Amino acid sequence: MEDINRLLQIRKTVLQMLSDREYIITAYEQEYPRESFVSRENLTMYCVKKDDPTDSIYVFFPDTPKVGVTQIKKYVDIMKDRQANRAIIVVQQNITPFAKQALAEFSQEKKITLEQFNEAELLVNITHHQLVPKHILLTKEEKLELLTRYKMKESQLPRIQTNDPVARYYGLSRGHVVKIVRPSETAGRYITYRLCV
């Protein structure tokens, strides 16, 4: 029972993450029946982006505590069948070193993005914490407008690492610019921009 409650919380955080990344969440995904939590594989989700139906994502929940290369290959084949270019793998414990290497190879060769999150990382939605400011991913047009307005180069922007927890939550990759809105006692709100490196 405790395991089901844990999975419910993880699934809720994943749905919030997909929604924040602007993927369409169906009513079925939101009201997923509790009885279906028998197997983690049943929790697999497929979503498409609101403004671009060709941009799709899979979320996999492997049954085994440690994920190996064979499972990674299986997930890549599933992605190829639906022409998905991005996936999130939610692992119970860890991913084997060979599987990590396979993740990197598939990402380079097949032009797909495979992200890995531990279940413990998804028990709490970090963006809902009071100390984490609001992050907004800028489009290419908004990024160009920002650089021309302030007459600066991309390299002059402050940086955020790709392995930063919030950057991972939003699925940022190199070159993305994020707008960070913080509350300020003197100015009302304080806006900064960061380049993902």
Swiss-Prot record:
<comment type="function">
    <text>DNA-dependent RNA polymerase catalyzes the transcription of DNA into RNA using the four ribonucleoside triphosphates as substrates. Common component of RNA polymerases I, II and III which synthesize ribosomal RNA precursors, mRNA precursors and many functional non-coding RNAs, and small RNAs, such as 5S rRNA and tRNAs, respectively. Pol II is the central component of the basal RNA polymerase II transcription machinery. Pols are composed of mobile elements that move relative to each other.</text>
</comment>
<keyword id="KW-0240">DNA-directed RNA polymerase</keyword>
<dbReference type="GO" id="GO:0005736">
    <property type="term" value="C:RNA polymerase I complex"/>
</dbReference>
<dbReference type="InterPro" id="IPR035913">
    <property type="entry name" value="RPB5-like_sf"/>
</dbReference>
<dbReference type="Pfam" id="PF01191">
    <property type="entry name" value="RNA_pol_Rpb5_C"/>
</dbReference>
<dbReference type="GO" id="GO:0005666">
    <property type="term" value="C:RNA polymerase III complex"/>
</dbReference>
<dbReference type="InterPro" id="IPR005571">
    <property type="entry name" value="RNA_pol_Rpb5_N"/>
</dbReference>
<protein>
    <recommendedName>
        <fullName>DNA-directed RNA polymerases I, II, and III subunit rpabc1</fullName>
    </recommendedName>
</protein>
<dbReference type="GO" id="GO:0006366">
    <property type="term" value="P:transcription by RNA polymerase II"/>
</dbReference>
<dbReference type="GO" id="GO:0042797">
    <property type="term" value="P:tRNA transcription by RNA polymerase III"/>
</dbReference>
<dbReference type="GO" id="GO:0006362">
    <property type="term" value="P:transcription elongation by RNA polymerase I"/>
</dbReference>
<dbReference type="Pfam" id="PF03871">
    <property type="entry name" value="RNA_pol_Rpb5_N"/>
</dbReference>
<keyword id="KW-0804">Transcription</keyword>
<dbReference type="GO" id="GO:0005665">
    <property type="term" value="C:RNA polymerase II, core complex"/>
</dbReference>
<dbReference type="GO" id="GO:0003899">
    <property type="term" value="F:DNA-directed RNA polymerase activity"/>
</dbReference>
<dbReference type="GO" id="GO:0006383">
    <property type="term" value="P:transcription by RNA polymerase III"/>
</dbReference>
<dbReference type="GO" id="GO:0003677">
    <property type="term" value="F:DNA binding"/>
</dbReference>
<dbReference type="InterPro" id="IPR000783">
    <property type="entry name" value="RNA_pol_subH/Rpb5_C"/>
</dbReference>
<dbReference type="GO" id="GO:0006360">
    <property type="term" value="P:transcription by RNA polymerase I"/>
</dbReference>
<comment type="similarity">
    <text>Belongs to the archaeal Rpo5/eukaryotic RPB5 RNA polymerase subunit family.</text>
</comment>
<keyword id="KW-0539">Nucleus</keyword>
<dbReference type="InterPro" id="IPR036710">
    <property type="entry name" value="RNA_pol_Rpb5_N_sf"/>
</dbReference>
<comment type="subunit">
    <text>Component of the RNA polymerase I (Pol I), RNA polymerase II (Pol II) and RNA polymerase III (Pol III) complexes consisting of at least 13, 12 and 17 subunits, respectively. In RNA Pol II, this subunit is present in 2-fold molar excess over the other subunits.</text>
</comment>
<dbReference type="InterPro" id="IPR020608">
    <property type="entry name" value="RNA_pol_subH/Rpb5_CS"/>
</dbReference>
<dbReference type="InterPro" id="IPR014381">
    <property type="entry name" value="Arch_Rpo5/euc_Rpb5"/>
</dbReference>
